[in-house]
């Protein structure tokens, strides 16, 4: 793996991102309480406000649309708070649309090929730009270091923003009269997509590409986030971090998902993944089975990054597109 401009940033609690009046309280206590109360009221935490942001449209030379709107979550950067998306419309009907949520540090243009393949099989695709990525990245960053950070509170806020931005995209598609909405998320986009899926009944089907139940464990054990762990482990244990980041962990909401009416959901993971280690994926699958949550499972014999290379990217794409075809058309 290339060590491309990864920077070990200082550890920070970031209590200001969860409380406006910490009053010099022990940050561990603040995050324990925040985690407990947020999980109990997660519908409110991930709620989409009733007031809608104005969505601006710009047509590209390929008759695709660039969208932008103001995020419902105010972050540390006004540049980040202007959400960006690209729409690849299927013009013959509005039977189905897919929200595509990319991986961490995805580059401009990533997933455009997938979106155009979805077009070819009669589906509209909306490719979302994650917080602190691409046009949303502040000038002082080279990587999206505020989305997954050694800052406990900032990471919570950033993932919440990603989820609410995703739900905003779903609502916009519903307002355009699409009959069925799906979501395809990869890596951190899988986590974001899962959180949106559990909290938004307007999403009819989902594909989660790379799977883990606990946000903290991926950061702690994954190869891609070694630089984040290096800062975290000086001040905090994995067990503590797992507790504090439960509000943004899919495993937290398994019972909530089990209580809902079944919706088609496919989980894709790889045997030799060093970023989402295989034991984390298997633990998640086990919890789905224990709760009798109907789901589809695909395991590919490659690694995290090789999933984006031939021939695995073709197989992965086929598994994504075919599932969407079967359940959203």
Indicate where each model-derived feature is located.
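N-terminal targeting or regulatory segments adjacent to alpha/beta-hydrolase or S9 domains
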Residues: 1-72
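A short loop-to-beta-strand scaffold at the N-terminal edge of the catalytic core in hydrolase folds
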Residues: 78-89
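Short beta-strand element of the alpha/beta-hydrolase
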Residues: 84, 94-103
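Cap/lid segment of the alpha/beta-hydrolase catalytic domain
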Residues: 103-160
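Alpha/beta-hydrolase fold nucleophile elbow
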Residues: 174-187
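Hydrolase active-site cap/lid region
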Residues: 194-239
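The feature captures the conserved acid-bearing segment of alpha/beta-hydrolase catalytic domains
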Residues: 221-280, 286
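C-terminal catalytic histidine-bearing segment of alpha/beta-hydrolase fold enzymes
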Residues: 282-329
